[in-house]
Amino acid sequence: MEHHANIVPWQMLCERSGATLKVAPIDARGELDLEAFRALLSPRTRLAAFTQVSNALGTVLPVREMVAAAKGVGALTLIDGAQAVPHQRVDVQALRCDFYAFSGNKLYGPTGIGVLYGREALLREMPPWQGGGDMILTVSFAGSTWNELPWKFEAGTPNIAGAVGLGAAVDWLEALGIDAVHAHEQALLARATAQLRSIPGLRLIGDAAHKGAVISFVMDGVHPHDLGTILDAEGVAVRTGHHC
């Protein structure tokens, strides 16, 4: 369900801090067990981090309900929106999440740049994660003070070219119309799913009721890399093997 970017950092943090990482189960259809998720939450829960749309299964998670459940025990929430933002309308205010992150390359923009939304009150409380130029207000050998938001978190020379490219990608997507993009992709998803189901020996992975335009599948007796090579020779682009 989750991208490695929403697994590995928390494992590393738990190793450093002694925190415990808990994982909510999914069912055979690739859908989150929402009641099991709620059962994992307690007043000791500090952060609930989850994807909005799975990059591997296409499952669209019930993020509003998940945010509400986490807030009910006083936990902060972070949503990985990398697979959602380019394909559907997203309103972080309506979701009521504390943090929301997505990448530039999934938005058809440059690599090496992304976006992190955070509630202003939380960002003001947080210390800088990196030191350097621009993130300071004053500097002396006796001590330094930090700049205002968002510059407090932008140490050093930023990825200027990447930011310009990301802005152009956003403009292009907005010109297409995100609702039109979503409708077109859902039509393609329905057609592709129906066609794939008709192929003998092909098994779809994940059959959630609400899906983004992602389909994972395997073929009986055929290694995914071999299948990918054959499809590539026919001009069909697929992703095979280990996802990130």
Regions found by a protein language model. Name each.
Residues 1-244:
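Pyridoxal 5′-phosphate
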